[in-house]
Amino acid sequence: MTMDGPAHMPRRYVTFQGVNVEGLSQQLIARILFHVADPAKSNAFWEHFKAKLADADKTLARTADSLCLLCGAIGYIDELFEDNDDEEGLTILRRLEDELC
């Protein structure tokens, strides 16, 4: 099984050969979840984002995979990291934005 379905199916992101799509996405997701686990830092947007993220790995249930969700929320993620002085998160976000979005 790959992040895009059974191993016999072609990968969706073939143009990103040589880029660790899964690893970079998971690093960014970990930084986001670290912050929004604190109810004081979360809001309705992040709760909805977490619900969509939970379905992102379910090929038949998802409306978007994790990379699509991340790329669609760049502005919100940037604001979250800026508000929390998360330089590591911002660095990962810039890399994801430059290499994948």
Swiss-Prot record:
Pfam families from the UniProt entry: CowN
Keyword Nucleus in annotation: no
Superkingdom: Bacteria
Annotated keywords: Nitrogen fixation
Induction: Up-regulated by RcoM in the presence of CO. Its expression is enhanced in the presence of a poor nitrogen source, like glutamate, that allows nif derepression.
InterPro entries per the UniProt record, alphabetical: CowN
Described purpose of this protein according to its UniProt entry: Is required to sustain N(2)-dependent growth in the presence of low levels of carbon monoxide (CO). Probably acts by protecting the N(2) fixation ability of the nitrogenase complex, which is inactivated in the presence of CO. Is not required for CO-dependent growth.
Protein name stated in the entry: N(2)-fixation sustaining protein CowN
Provenance organism: Rhodospirillum rubrum (strain ATCC 11170 / ATH 1.1.1 / DSM 467 / LMG 4362 / NCIMB 8255 / S1)
